[in-house]
Amino acid sequence: MIAIVTDRPNVGREIARVLGADRKENGYMTGNGYMVTWTYGNMLSLAMPKDSGTARVEWKDFPLLPPSFLTVRHVKTDTGWNPDINALLQLKIIAKVLNACDTIIAATDASREGEMLFRHLYGFLECKQPSLRLWISSLTDEAITEGMASLLPCDRFDNLFQAADSRNRADWLLGVNSSYAICKAVGFGNNSLGRVQTPVLAEICRRYRERENFLPADSWQVFVSLCKDRQIIKLRHTEDFQEYRYASELYGDCKAVRNARIAAVNRESEDIRAPAPYNLTELQKDANRYHNLTAIQVQDITQGLYEKKLISYPRTASRLLTRDVYDTLPAVMEKILSRKEFRQYAKMTDFAAPPSDISAQGTTDHHAIIVTGMPPGTLNKEEQLVYTLILGRTLEAFMPSCRVEYTTIDVVCAARKFSVQTYRVLKKGWLSIFGREHLIARGGMPCSALPDFSPGEPVPVSGCNIVRKRTLPVSPYTDEELVGYMDRSGLGTVSTRTNIIRTLLERKYIRYSGKYVIPTPKGLFFYETVCGMKVADTSLTSGWEAELARIEQGKLTQEEFLGGVLEQVKEVTGEIFRIYQAKNNP
């Protein structure tokens, strides 16, 4: 018998169906020589100090090191944190399945986290059987069948596991040590300081405080209106005035002028290529911008669409497609373009020469998110919105460039320079799909066709006006901005950022106010406690991902990486210890 382990029941059942393992048992499927079982996510974790008998932590015990054993996932109950009974029961079922089989196939997520989940499970249950890896990027019948026909040796992914395990141990080192230390220093118990969670909360709070403390300032803009061919063109003075009297002086000068002179006319055309296909971060940003869906909603929805075989693996950081994946897309596009709403674009798509920024080797765990071409069937409103974004972006990538003409006109009026910038679309190309012209507008310039002007030409001034401009406070973070900030700052990965937001919500550090993410009183109190500390600084661990990538490539060892992390932990706990000393020795 061959055992197959997945990390979700739905995925396990789908693989079992394709393989003919159609007999349902408690916690697994069996048949046709296979036993397919599953975990409920990651059911194992590194042990905590209390699990190894450490009842009380003293300053001399720092830095704390992770015990060498794993424990079953704990959940909060009325009696405190206890082992998850559902995880315990499923682990017994998995052990039964694995003990009954000669070979084990790891069918967990084809990613760092999925690899670590299987390796930890394999070690925890003390398995000895040979193991193979199923590595697929979609759950279509074809992908599963092809993957099973080309199983890979597990040792090929040793470096991937080392990277995941290193990240897991580093998170434990920094999170547990800083949490225990801050609790001991300032009595801030029942709270955790995660290496990503804390700087993200600090940034949300910093921006919230900046908004609270904001003082508005006024400036004044002067506009002149020119008239040609019965068309009014409004131009703005190139500088804003901080004092009204200077704006008023220029306004008076312009009112006294009958004609302005065209100083320069610049027209340029540009072919703008379609955006690359989505990764999860870009999809979360667009779904929040256009449909007000949260990052958590988008991750959950895409996982559901993946399990329904409608899209490829969603938790990817890549926006690239390898050549072999690209070669499958004409057949996928044929299915899409047969749909009524997309039939008009059939003649516009071109698969003959893949764009260089689309077809590439060396993607991360998975290629960009694309549709599989399977009929979507019945989807709820939110699923349909996300699916349409992915579908449209997949189609956009293989349509012609959009041609845009940008025009800048400079005018001299009352010896001062005024300017206007506009654009117009000459050929829509990929812009035909969603029509989102803000993607091509430079600096928010308007779309407008201007009359023909020539340098030196006098043009009648039809009016002028002054506009007061008041600075506005920065808005709290939206999910679009927050995941973008985390991405730019190197905080977390595409597959972990959503869980960081989820954790902050569950621990009541943050909440939603409409579309904005704002801190709670508890979150602000926590922020005031750690503000200025290294543990709240994004730079503390922003280089981790680059080092983890080097471990994955075999260029850095786990010992070297964790040695550097341990030095960071000593800095963090040392800083907290100094706070403790100052508190007790005022």
What is each PLM-predicted segment?
Residues 1-3, 108-110, 187-190, 267-276, ...:
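Conserved short loop/turn motifs at secondary-structure junctions
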Residues 1-168, 172-174, 465:
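Intrinsically disordered, low-complexity regulatory segments
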Residues 2, 25, 80-82, 87, ...:
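Basic, low-complexity terminal or inter-domain segments flanking catalytic cores
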Residues 49, 100-105, 232-247, 251, ...:
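OB-fold/S1-family RNA-binding modules
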Residues 185-192, 203-247, 290, 429-431:
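C-terminal helical "lid" subdomain and adjoining coupling/linker elements of P-loop NTPases
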Residues 197:
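Conserved PLP-enzyme active-site core in the AAT-like
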Residues 242-278, 284:
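Metal- or metallocofactor-binding catalytic centers and their adjacent structured scaffolds
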